[in-house]
Every structure is written in C-alpha cells, then in structure tokens.
Amino acid sequence: MKQNKKLILSSIVAALALFLMIIAGIMPIGTYAIPVLASLLYIVLVKEIGYGWAVMAYAVTSIMSLILCADKETAINFILFFGYYPILEMQLKKIKLLVLRIIVKLTIFNAAMIVIFYIATFVLMVPASAYTVFGLYIPWIILAVGNVVFIIYDLSLIHISEPTRH
C-alpha cells in the first residue's frame, strides 16, 4: 500500500476513534465501553498497514482525546490501557509460554488500572463515593471483577484479530 493510502487509513481510524471518545460523555456506560470500542479500530491498522501506523494513530487519538473529550476519565482509560492494548496484544502473542503470556497480560492490565484509579482519584478528583457501594469502599473488588472482564476482552481481541479458519 502506498504511503498516502496508509496515512489516509490511519487518519480515518484516528478520527473514528476520536469521534467515539467524544460521544462517550453523553452515554452512561461510555467511560469504559467506548474506549473498548475505539480500541478495536486499531486492529485494522496493525493488520493492514503495520504497528508503526497504529501507534501513530493511537498517539493522535490520545492527545486529541485529552483536549476534546468532556469526560477526562474516559480519555485516561483510553490513553493508559484500552488504546494501546490491542496493538500490544498482537505483539504479546509472540510469547510462546502460555502461562507467562497470561501473567504479562494481567500484570499490564492491573498496573494500568491501578494508575488509572489513582489519576481519577487524585488528579481528576473523582469522589470516594464513586467507589462506595452500601457504605463499602470497593476498589479491590472492582479490580477483581475487572480482571474477569479483561480476560473476556482479551479473548475477544484474540478471536477478532486472528484470521477465520474454515
């Protein structure tokens, strides 16, 4: 594919991802669901034109999300995990030992979620009540449930990014 077509495709993906990120502010589940949807677009870039272009589109979407998204927590979720993970996941497939690959993926996810939690709490000033249910402060429970959801997300990415076998 010619360079100008690669630029056009990566620009379209970045624009679509940014559009999704911007509309996340008007959807109740947008903080988590929209970054996941936006992240799926980067699989196309990796498959069609390569990692470099996907990383460039991710960087553009990340910067523009910080500037244009009303919901900064959504932008942070995208920047610190969901935006780059599909690109990275395709590289993590190269780790042959399944147990090691799973440990690496879960470590990346948990580290990102902990950083996102602290940024949301101390920089974006998300109140502690957002992490409280029936008087219980539950960030660790949320993280545990998040690990289960992450495994489903990761398995979905694997199946989406692999060619269909007949």
What are these regions (language model features)?
Residues 79-114:
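Short helix-perturbing small/polar motifs within transmembrane alpha-helices
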Residues 54-64, 101-110:
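Central hydrophobic cores of alpha-helical transmembrane segments
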Residues 7-11, 33, 55-59, 75-76, ...:
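Hydrophobic alpha-helical transmembrane segments
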Residues 22-31, 62-91:
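Interfacial aromatic-anchored transmembrane helix boundaries in multi-pass membrane proteins
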Residues 1-48, 53:
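Hydrophobic transmembrane alpha-helices
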Residues 156-166:
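Residue-level detector of conserved catalytic or cofactor/ligand-binding positions
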Residues 123-136:
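Membrane-interface helix termini and inter-helical loops of multi-pass transporters
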Residues 17-21, 65, 85, 109-117, ...:
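Alpha-helical transmembrane segments of multipass membrane proteins
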